[in-house]
């Protein structure tokens, strides 16, 4: 079993207790802020159903989104950055934030952006953040993944969901190797669930 799959299996087991506890008090509130890569979840009913089991998920997945810097423009629309989106939700952000952003920028400034989003999310009442790694179809994405993994050492409330490792070799993508097919969107939704429950249970000890 590859390391990515092994870690995922451990997370599934570890998240069961948190899911059982949350079921007694209603769906767990979650906000998912992303760019166009995870956006397929927004229009694939099976993917939404997979992600939302036991969760009250707000999907904010926008084409051309960047982390902190001004987003690019697509078909005349410029979405708010991930930071602006997070800040805009205030105390309604939810218990868990999922971030899957970085394909429209380099790793320059990404470290500072992670820290700003972490501070905002925690100040707004989130227990923590699930941060999704990028598919390394370009060398610049490797640099961003290095930054994401290093951030987990600074922030015990940040849990890295290594989508790059887990999705390696899978036929879930379009021609660019990034954007998801319907099967890929459902796979990403299923992949994220145990990470969400793990974060909801509280930060891991050092």
Where in this protein do the model-derived segments appear?
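Conserved beta-strand segments of alpha/beta enzyme cores
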Residues: 56-58, 128, 157-159
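N-terminal low-complexity, Pro/Thr-rich disordered segments
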Residues: 20-26, 203-206
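Conserved SGNH/GDSL esterase-like catalytic core that processes O-acyl groups on lipids
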Residues: 27-113, 140-142
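Sec-exported extracytoplasmic/periplasmic mature domains
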Residues: 38, 42, 46, 50, ...
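Secretory targeting and sorting signals
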Residues: 2-24
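Active-site segments of SGNH/GDSL-like serine hydrolases
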Residues: 98-104, 115-147
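Catalytic His-Asp segment of secreted/periplasmic serine-dependent ester chemistry enzymes
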Residues: 136-206
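Residues at the C-termini of beta-strands that transition into short coil/loop
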Residues: 61-63, 133-135, 164
């Amino acid at each position: 079993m590859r390391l990515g799959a092994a870690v995922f299996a451990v997370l599934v087991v570890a998240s069961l207790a948190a899911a059982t506890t949350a079921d007694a008090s209603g769906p767990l509130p979650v906000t998912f802020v992303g760019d166009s890569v995870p956006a397929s979840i927004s229009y694939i009913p099976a993917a939404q159903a997979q992600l939302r089991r036991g969760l009250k998920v707000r999907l904010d997945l926008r084409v051309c989104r960047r982390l902190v810097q001004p987003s690019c423009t697509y078909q005349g629309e410029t979405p708010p950055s991930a930071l602006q989106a997070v800040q805009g939700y205030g105390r309604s952000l939810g218990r868990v934030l999922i971030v899957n952003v970085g394909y429209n920028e380099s790793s320059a400034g990404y470290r500072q952006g992670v820290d700003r989003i972490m501070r905002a999310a925690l100040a707004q009442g989130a227990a923590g953040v699930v941060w999704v790694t990028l598919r390394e179809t370009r060398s610049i994405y490797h640099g961003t993944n290095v930054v994401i993994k290093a951030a987990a050492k600074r922030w015990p409330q940040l849990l890295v969901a290594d989508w790059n490792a887990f999705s390696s070799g899978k036929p879930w993508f379009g021609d660019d190797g990034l954007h998801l097919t319907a099967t890929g969107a459902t796979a990403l939704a299923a992949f994220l669930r145990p990470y969400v429950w793990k974060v909801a249970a509280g930060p891991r000890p050092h």
